[in-house]
């Protein structure tokens, strides 16, 4: 009776294991990405719930930026983002308590707040950058300049001006409010520049890297939160006129899309 294993048999077994691993690895990676994408979607749902809670209490949405400070503008302007204002309405009262709203967002008294991560604002698919904290992967939609170059403050979140739900005349269901904006230059949840105009398609490879645009690390699309609170994964192939229509709050456009 032969009790040993020949070298050939061992190599065959190793080869089979390698083939199985190669076949299973993509499936495992895909399953992990699906879980991360689901978490990203849940993050935006929490943001949507916070916006509705904010509106229920104050009868208005937050402004996109409170006391907007233009580039090289007066340093006394506070420049706080909508994403800082809604913190108490998404169970982040402790982080909200770190913010001194009597001083500008980048005042030394707000250093700790600026360095504090808020888990809901971080998409798990986006690689963490060592030394970067207080970031957000979601930006408010200031408007679109896909179909127009004038009056581009046609979105839900603009400088200094808060809107009520009734001001979103295209309907809450049909108006995007917040979208993934990974890797943008103004990606801090406290920074009032966390709003942007969309000028191209989703994950547009032609978009300048230093522009804030709808971008994600997901395959083939990005998560978008609509004003009603629902979230959609919108494909890179979304038509530009459709994307423009879903961003405007009062454009009176008709559009349909397969999510």
Kindly give the residue locations of the regions a language model identified.
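N-terminal single-pass transmembrane signal-anchor helix
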Residues: 2-36, 46
């Amino acid at each position: 009776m032969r009790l040993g294993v020949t070298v050939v048999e061992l190599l065959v077994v190793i080869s089979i294991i390698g083939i199985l691993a190669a076949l299973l690895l993509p499936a495992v990676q895909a399953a992990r990405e699906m879980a991360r994408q689901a978490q990203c979607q849940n993050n935006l749902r929490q943001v949507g719930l916070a916006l509705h809670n904010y509106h229920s209490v104050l009868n208005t949405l937050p402004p996109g930026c409170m006391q907007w400070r233009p580039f090289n503008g007066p340093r006394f302007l506070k420049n706080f983002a909508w994403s800082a204002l809604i913190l108490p309405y998404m169970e982040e009262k402790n982080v909200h308590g770190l913010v001194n709203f009597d001083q500008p967002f980048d005042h030394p008294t707000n250093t700790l707040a600026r360095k504090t991560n808020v888990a809901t604002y971080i998409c798990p698919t986006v690689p963490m950058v060592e030394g970067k904290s207080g970031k957000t992967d979601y930006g408010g939609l200031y408007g679109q300049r896909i179909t127009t170059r004038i009056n581009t403050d046609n979105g839900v979140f603009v400088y200094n001006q808060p809107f009520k739900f009734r001001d979103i005349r295209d309907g809450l269901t049909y108006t995007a409010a917040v979208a993934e904006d990974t890797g943008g230059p103004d990606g801090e949840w406290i920074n009032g520049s966390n709003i942007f105009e969309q000028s191209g398609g989703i994950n547009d490879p032609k978009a300048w890297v230093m522009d804030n645009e709808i971008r994600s690390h997901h395959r083939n699309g990005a998560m978008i939160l609509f004003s009603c609170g629902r979230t959609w994964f919108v494909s890179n192939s979304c038509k530009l006129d459709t994307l423009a229509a879903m961003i405007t709050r009062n454009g009176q456009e008709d559009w349909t899309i397969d999510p």
